[in-house]
Amino acid sequence: MARYTGPKARINRRLGTMLYETAGAARAMDRRPQPPGMHTRGRRPSNYGAALMEKQKIKHYYGLGERQLRRYFENVGRKSGNTGELLLLMCERRLDNVVRRVGFTKTRPQARQGITHGHFRVNGVKVTKPGYMLRAGDLIEVRGRENLKNLYRGVIANSPPDGLDWVSFDSETLRATVLSLPGAVDISLPVDANSVVEFLSR
């Protein structure tokens, strides 16, 4: 997929939330929270425009392309339950999301880079796909090279992780264990998923 490489702060401001977590993007959002560009009197977006913005939030936050998002949508559409909630829960199970949320990295792009460079193993096997779907019982660990371990120890020391209810994390051994699948309370992105479902169903 074509990964967004432009100004992160611009996306945060346009969509009105902190989707990219770099220090520069955070400072820019604090200074100028309004959308980029010339500002006239604000107009309420149409239902289509509002749903499009919610879809864009999911794509940028989790690092998904359009086709990948639609594949996820088709997958959860075959299951029983709230489709919007199931879509977000599938995104939460991505390896790059969990690597970020347990505290191995400060941002999801950093997590994706580490995974594609082969820094992590799942159940003892090197995984290089950021979108790898984790299951209950999976063990994530940094590969045995000491320079890699020191790299991630430094990140953790500077930004202690908050912790997740569904994933245990040992900062000493650099291991994370998926205790269970995430639930609705574990979704980290505030978004109107139902409007996204309606948008993707068109």
Curated annotation (Swiss-Prot):
The molecular function terms of the Gene Ontology recorded here are:
rRNA binding; structural constituent of ribosome
Q: Mind telling me which PROSITE patterns this protein's record contains?
A: S4
**A matching Pfam family:** Ribosomal_S4
Which residue intervals define the domain S4 RNA-binding in the entry? Answer: 93-155
Alphabetically sorted, this entry's keywords are: Ribonucleoprotein, Ribosomal protein, RNA-binding, rRNA-binding
Recorded GO cellular component terms are: small ribosomal subunit
GO biological process terms held by the UniProt record: ribosomal small subunit biogenesis; translation
Which InterPro entries does the entry mention?
Ribosomal_uS4, Ribosomal_uS4_bac-type, Ribosomal_uS4_N, S4_RNA-bd, S4_RNA-bd_sf
Which family would the database say this protein is a member of?
Belongs to the universal ribosomal protein uS4 family.
What task does this protein carry out?
Answer: One of the primary rRNA binding proteins, it binds directly to 16S rRNA where it nucleates assembly of the body of the 30S subunit.
Under the subunit heading, UniProt states: Part of the 30S ribosomal subunit. Contacts protein S5. The interaction surface between S4 and S5 is involved in control of translational fidelity.
What protein name applies here?
Answer: Small ribosomal subunit protein uS4
Native species: Rhodopirellula baltica (strain DSM 10527 / NCIMB 13988 / SH1)
